[in-house]
Amino acid sequence: ARKYYRHLCDTFAEFYKLWHITEDEIKRRCVMVNVDVPHRYFEQGRSVIAFSGHYGNWEMMYSYKLWEKNVELVPIYKPIHNKIFDRMTCKIRSRFGATPLAKADTLRVMLRNQQEGKITMTGFIGDQTPNRRSLHFWTRFLNQDTAVLEGTERIARKLNQPVVFVNMRKVKRGHYHAEFYDLCSDPQSLEPGELTRMHI
């Protein structure tokens, strides 16, 4: 329990440090590994969906723009009820060039970006439990039936955008590696539910 609370406190402290951290320092503290995985798609003129979980300090992943300057980074987020804290959070997340996108606007903006020919990486975090109206997809996880969010798969199939998985790994206190893995280059070729199972 002590390690958990220490990690939680570290995560909050690291989040507020993002207010003033320099570009060089955040690139040292959050190293992007296998960036050639999404880069190959960008060279083909294709946008990418990046999927990750709430693990480590995912907020540091917004520095990806420092590694891939010619691509628009669009992290999906759920607005916070407190407007002041919401604006502050968005400001931190956009410090290095990311364009945070409210969850409710996701599909509309992604469709518009695709129609306009913008090359983007749209970031999804997806390990939360679905609300009651979204309990459509179930799978076995840790030997029990588990409801899983399937919005990422639905959007990926609709837009047929390649999907990569980002594994955020804590190397030591305050230092992370965000490693990219290729999940699927052609989501429409998969059976329904297959892509969701891939990233669980």
What are these regions (language model features)?
Residues 3, 7-10, 44-104, 131-140:
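Catalytic core of membrane glycerolipid acyltransferases/transacylases, capturing the structured
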Residues 1-49, 56-57, 178-181:
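Membrane-proximal helical "anchor" segments flanking the first transmembrane region
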Residues 2, 40-42, 68, 91, ...:
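Non-catalytic C-terminal accessory region of glycerolipid acyltransferases
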Residues 37, 61, 76, 88, ...:
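Short, hydrophobic/aromatic alpha-helical segments in well-folded domains
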